[in-house]
Amino acid sequence: MLEELECGAPGARGAATAMDCKDRPAFPVKKLIQARLPFKRLNLVPKGKADDMSDDQGTSVQSKSPDLEASLDTLENNCHVGSDIDFRPKLVNGKGPLDNFLRNRIETSIGQSTVIIDLTEDSNEQPDSLVDHNKLNSEASPSREAINGQREDTGDQQGLLKAIQNDKLAFPGETLSDIPCKTEEEGVGCGGAGRRGDSQECSPRSCPELTSGPRMCPRKEQDSWSEAGGILFKGKVPMVVLQDILAVRPPQIKSLPATPQGKNMTPESEVLESFPEEDSVLSHSSLSSPSSTSSPEGPPAPPKQHSSTSPFPTSTPLRRITKKFVKGSTEKNKLRLQRDQERLGKQLKLRAEREEKEKLKEEAKRAKEEAKKKKEEEKELKEKERREKREKDEKEKAEKQRLKEERRKERQEALEAKLEEKRKKEEEKRLREEEKRIKAEKAEITRFFQKPKTPQAPKTLAGSCGKFAPFEIKEHMVLAPRRRTAFHPDLCSQLDQLLQQQSGEFSFLKDLKGRQPLRSGPTHVSTRNADIFNSDVVIVERGKGDGVPERRKFGRMKLLQFCENHRPAYWGTWNKKTALIRARDPWAQDTKLLDYEVDSDEEWEEEEPGESLSHSEGDDDDDMGEDEDEDDGFFVPHGYLSEDEGVTEECADPENHKVRQKLKAKEWDEFLAKGKRFRVLQPVKIGCVWAADRDCAGDDLKVLQQFAACFLETLPAQEEQTPKASKRERRDEQILAQLLPLLHGNVNGSKVIIREFQEHCRRGLLSNHTGSPRSPSTTYLHTPTPSEDAAIPSKSRLKRLISENSVYEKRPDFRMCWYVHPQVLQSFQQEHLPVPCQWSYVTSVPSAPKEDSGSVPSTGPSQGTPISLKRKSAGSMCITQFMKKRRHDGQIGAEDMDGFQADTEEEEEEEGDCMIVDVPDAAEVQAPCGAASGAGGGVGVDTGKATLTASPLGAS
């Protein structure tokens, strides 16, 4: 009788499942009730048959199949080995690991005719060969794998897996006949039996020959058979072992190969129809073991000794098992096996998932470590690269610094060399200047006497020339003679004779035909004579340089230039003549003279820019100055004075000396700026001229007459010098008295005032007595003659009087204009002069600016000017009229005197006088009139190297 074990069947599988019960939370608690009495077995056999069963068991001990006992021992040994490996002895609810190890004794009496019936086959025919068995065995494994994939997780995976692995027992692959097999599992089974306390002996077992002859079972086929829970499995397929009740046939029946449970199974009716009796299918010995092991309370079977050979009994008592019972047991086994397979599949799946997770964790951990390691390597690599780059940058920086230091040293050395060279040049230049200065000082002894300036010759006007109007004859112009031939007295007397002795014999027509016209040379005007009279030195032109060609010989200079060419134009001579290019054919080509195929513009190459001459510009200037000095010869520049040269007691003031030096230097610079070159003056040597040879040496006489000795008149007595000085002072007083009305309050410049005053004097519009003497005590020692009154004062005298007696400044009363000093106005009794002045102009004067027109009071028609002159002068006003700077009292300068227009013309020296004026302080200027005349500064007048006393006009 087969039944499903709730907690675990005894045997190999029961041992595995019993140890797993404690770890399975899914199983109910009621299934553990049977474990409380481990040694009590339930006897499912009726009491009436107990004796029979004991007898049957006693008889079946000798008739047991050796192969089944070996398989069971192997199963138990495998279970013990697996349990020892997988479990530890623990007590749960008083139940130990040996409680579920129930010894299963299968007491079956297998007769000579033993038949193994596979309930899954369609017929009970015996297979002819072993091929079907191997095929079914191979088909069982995929079905098992398919079932394992669908199991559920209901318990401990490890314990169940070990139990399933221990269920595999070694069974013959071909038949169940008693074949002598000697395997390693027997030793294991012996060991397992010893552990359970069984007294089985490990000895080789002999299987009786059920087939044609004895065969050795291979190890692989033995492993395919197993027993679990009293059910015999081949692989994973349960097998049922039947015995023939009749025992008629000889025991030469081959075992049928088993097929998996998963395949198509035939109904049990078809299986049982092959036997003579339907009710007697299984023997009592084949089912005694399952029935006895199904009850945990039944007593364990005593251990038995197995011999190597066991003869089959001729007759074995059998027990009837119904088909319904067999079918139920089979279904239960199938369900249990399916559940075990599902559970095992789930456990395997969970284990695979766990292993996969662990594998993934390991891989993630390994990947993380690799990433960390890689990151560290990258970090180290970057640090190494950064360190190498920093070292490289430091090396480059050090190299650059070294190169920079070397370049700096080179520049410093070059600069020092240049400075040394410049210092040497300056030293050489200083030595040359010193030599020149020494030469110039020595040359002062041999200096030529300079001729004083002569007044310009008056303009000469040609007389009436018929229909031509009179015209001016300039210095370089000469009137042509009216008669080319010279008039001789002989020719004149001959003409008179011919006129007196006229006769008709001579024909005038014949005379005209045969007479030859007279010839005369060109009218030549000698320019040398004019130069000789104007200068005491004859200027001799130096010969032309060797490199200058003669124009007459080489012809005119020509310019060949084209706008589309980059090549510079040609400037020079072109003397080649051609016979092909003419005026009528200007575009003809002369291939003999010119090559028209060559483009000279393409061959032109621009010159590379030269080196910088910033350091040598001063040298060039020095060279130019040296050249000019060489051209000047032994003459020193204008204004150059040696030590103590030209210094007199009157000129001892260093400030005035500096001012004069600056003025002369400025004049010299302006003269050089005009681009005038100097010519070397060479002396002309003229020998003695005798009185007899005057006609021959007429030109030389004219030159020498300029230096002829003349007798000077005897100088007057010393007393006569004082009236002469007084005369000049009186003339200045007279001019100043007439100038005051025009000067005081005038907004125009000194040039306009001087020109207007001279024009008035030229027209005779000024009265002789417009002013009074400076003081009552002053008396005229000499009455001016009409010629003196009619004489026009010079510009220099008028300018001197204006600068001495007035100042050009801005005062609260009026804007910038000329203000005469109060003491001067008081001395001439003209304090009432208006500001601005009321003067009737006879010349055109510039109009006043618009911004100041409002502050200027009306001056009547005398101050008005034409509108055209106003418009014309408004656009050319000087910027100095907008200057609002207040001058200090007593400060007189050239700019203050000139007003709107600066006087840049040179002052003409009148009568060779040179006056040095000492300007008093402001306190002296504002002194009373009486004190002013006595405290006036001294004025030195150099007239023929004579020093005169000061006059009251000297004080300002």
From Swiss-Prot:
PxVxL motif (motif): residue ranges: 233-246
Keyword Amino-acid biosynthesis among record annotations: no
Keywords: Cell cycle, Chaperone, Chromatin regulator, DNA damage, DNA repair, DNA replication, Isopeptide bond, Nucleus, Phosphoprotein, Ubl conjugation
Chain positions with Phosphothreonine modification: 722, 865
GO biological process: DNA repair; DNA replication; DNA replication-dependent chromatin assembly; nucleosome assembly
Cellular-component GO terms for this entry: CAF-1 complex; chromatin; nucleus; protein-containing complex
Region (Binds to CBX1 chromo shadow domain): 1-314
InterPro entries: CAF-1_p150_acidic (IPR021644), CAF1-p150_C2 (IPR029105), CAF1_p150_N (IPR029091), CAF1A_DD (IPR022043)
Region (Binds to p60): 660-956
Biased composition (Acidic residues): 599-610, 618-633
Biased composition (Low complexity): 282-296, 307-317
Keyword DNA repair set for record: yes
Entry's localization field: Nucleus
Similarity comment: family membership: Belongs to the CHAF1A family.
Subunit structure as annotated in this protein's UniProt entry: Homodimer. Part of the CAF-1 complex that contains RBBP4, CHAF1B and CHAF1A. CHAF1A binds directly to CHAF1B. Only minor amounts of RBBP4 are complexed with CHAF1A and CHAF1B in G1 phase. Interacts with PCNA; the interaction is direct. Interacts (via the PxVxL motif) with CBX5; the interaction is direct. Interacts with MBD1. Interacts with histones H3.1, H3.2 and H3.1t.
Purpose of the protein: Acts as a component of the histone chaperone complex chromatin assembly factor 1 (CAF-1), which assembles histone octamers onto DNA during replication and repair. CAF-1 performs the first step of the nucleosome assembly process, bringing newly synthesized histones H3 and H4 to replicating DNA; histones H2A/H2B can bind to this chromatin precursor subsequent to DNA replication to complete the histone octamer. It may play a role in heterochromatin maintenance in proliferating cells by bringing newly synthesized cbx proteins to heterochromatic DNA replication foci.
Protein's name according to its UniProt entry: Chromatin assembly factor 1 subunit A
